[in-house]
Each structure stands twice: as structure tokens, then as C-alpha cells.
Amino acid sequence: MVPEPRPGGALLWPAAILRRTNVMDHRHPVSGLRYPVSGIRYPVSGIVKIAARLWTRLIHPMTPSRFDALTSQFARLRVGVIGDFSLDRYFDIDPAKAETSLETGLPVHNVTRVRCSPGAAGNIVQNLGALGAGTLWPIGFCGEDGEGFELLKALRAVPGVSLDNFLRTPDRRTFTYTKPLVHQPSKAPVELSRLDIKNWLPTPSDVEEELGIALRNLGPELDALIVMDQAGVPDAGVVTPAILRHVRDLTLAHPRLFVVADSRHGLGRFPPLIFKMNAAEFAVLNGGRADAALPELKAGAERLATASKRPVFITLAERGIVGAAPGVPAVHVPALPVRGGIDIVGAGDSVTAALTLALAAGAQIEEAMVLAQAAASIVIHQLGTTGAAHVPELRARLFP
């Protein structure tokens, strides 16, 4: 739970927080520290700094030396990312330049800038690169179209990327999110209705076979693999049943390989891997509720980790993240305090990237979750873009 913004540059602790607070001694319900009744309202800058320091000292176990030891390993790590790569294309619109179409009488939105970046699995690659991963192998496809050209250009700009295993094929369209954003002075960008380009027919078997061969050949080279399923049309993306069989075979051939799976459409069809999901996705998989209380979520994560013999992570937005490993009690790491306006697009990808690098670097699950929460906290404050976090930013966020 984080303070709520109020007009005039102040924050109030939400009513739910105050109801759980001992009114007699005025203790904060998370930190246990006292604060005066008259001091419940604080200036924004002060409360954010106080909350961040309390989170650092009382909630997470990371020390600066441990942080440095883990993140210094990122540069040696070799990570593959197989899944649905999209082009995120932003149309920046200036409403002051609005016109009316002479032909239709409809409003005309004049675009003053076009920005392109890798999306979906590509955004995970971008986050891995920003965190300093040594070598990155995207494994997926794009079409022989303009969007594919822009996607390849954006991927090439990510440090450490090798595109030797990325296919460009005339049999597929490039998965594209086009996001019109209206910009006004002193206001957060407003996104208009999105325009998507997807493939609606099954992925050709020869494309699947090429991707499977790439995965098999890369296996011995990898420290970690991320499987990202986002296409939304059954069997029309990269993560088809055939590709999941290749992933399963890879885990059997390389049992020490960290393989993290993230799917917008449910992990129930996946082989046993390290699962990362949000609360709604976990509810579908586990038969529970997305708004379940923490004890219920922790118990469910423990059961799933025991059954799969792999760690499980559940992201909970403003409630933080829950993680469990086989035979180890589940752990909850709260979210960091919010600092002004936020944009949650891309936060899940930053969590996936940070969790994967941390685990491959030797982190315990709680340490990995701390790094992931710091990454998400940075990304959500990057407005109008999917965003990415860098190691120095993580350090500054965790140790203010």
C-alpha cells in the first residue's frame, strides 16, 4: 500500500492503512515506526524519501555489497529470449495542430513524431540489455514488411544482441502495437485507441522447425532462457505446442538452465518451468481469485512450486510480489513507494528481466524479487513508453 496523492503537493496514507494503524501510539502498519497524528500529512518529497528508506531498512534483505556482487555478474550472462516479438510504434500527437478532414468532416490528429521500440519479447530483450546482460539471443520472427524493418533496427540497437537466430519471413506479418499519444503541456500523455497488427493463421511448420533448431543449438550456450507468450491468437505466434515441446526437451537436456516462462494467456499448457505471472493469471491457473489475500496467494505459490519443482513468482501490482521455491516458505516483497504519475506499461517485462538475471547470477528468490521490484518501480515512472531500468538506477532506488 502506498500513500495517495492529494492536491497541493501532499500525500495521505489511505484509509485502509489508517484503519489498520494503532491509533493510540500511531504506528505505521508496515514499518511499525511511530508518527504523530498531526504528521499524517507530509510533503511529497519528504514522504517519498522516508518511505523509500523505511522500505530499504525494514522490508528488503539486500545490502549494497550483496547488490554489487549480484549485478556485477550480469555482464557474463548469456540469455536467450524466445517468444512473440512486436514493434511498439508511438505516434506523438500535438492537439494544437488538430484539423478537420475536408472529405469526411472527422477530426485529424497530426503526428509530430514517430517512435519505435521493441515490444513484448523485444521489450524483455531491451530490459535485459539495459541491465547489462552480456549476450542476448532473440529467437522469434518478423515479417518482410516495414514494421519488420523497424523492429530489427530497434533490436540491433540493444547492447549485446545477436540476431543470428531471429527469422524474417514473408509468411508472417510483424506483430505491431501502434499507440497514438496526445501530448499536452504539464500533463501525462493520453493514449487513444490502439491499432494492432497480428497474424491470424497458424504459424507455418517450417518456421516452427527453424525456431526449434535455433533453440536446440543455443541450449549449451545459455545461462538462462525466457519464454514469452503474448500473441493472443492460438498457434499463430511463436510459442506453439511444437515450440513448447522443444522447450521441454531443452530443460531435460540442460537441467541447470534457468528457464522463465511468462504468458498473457495462461501457463497451464506449459511444461514445468520457472513461472512468472500476475494475480489474475495465477487465479486462472490455480482456480482462485485475483484479489486473494496474501496468505492464500503464498499458500498457492508454495503448492505450485512443490508440484513443478521450480520457483514461482506472482506479481501483485501495488501489493508487490510473492515468490516461492520448492520446499521453501513463500516470501512477500512489498512494492516500493510511488513517486508521482505512473504508467504501468512494460513493468511486467522489467520484472521478468530482473528476476531472470538475478536468479542466473546466484540470487535467492527474495533477493531476485527485491531487484525485480526496484526495476518495476523505475519503469512505471517512465511515462509514454514501455521503459527500461539500469543497474545504477536500481542501486539509487534501493539505497537512497
Walk through the language-model features, giving the residues of each.
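N-terminal polybasic/positive-inside topogenic patches
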Residues: 13-21
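Residue-level detector of intrinsically disordered terminal segments
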Residues: 20-23, 61
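Generic short N-terminal amphipathic or hydrophobic helices
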Residues: 16, 39, 46-49, 58
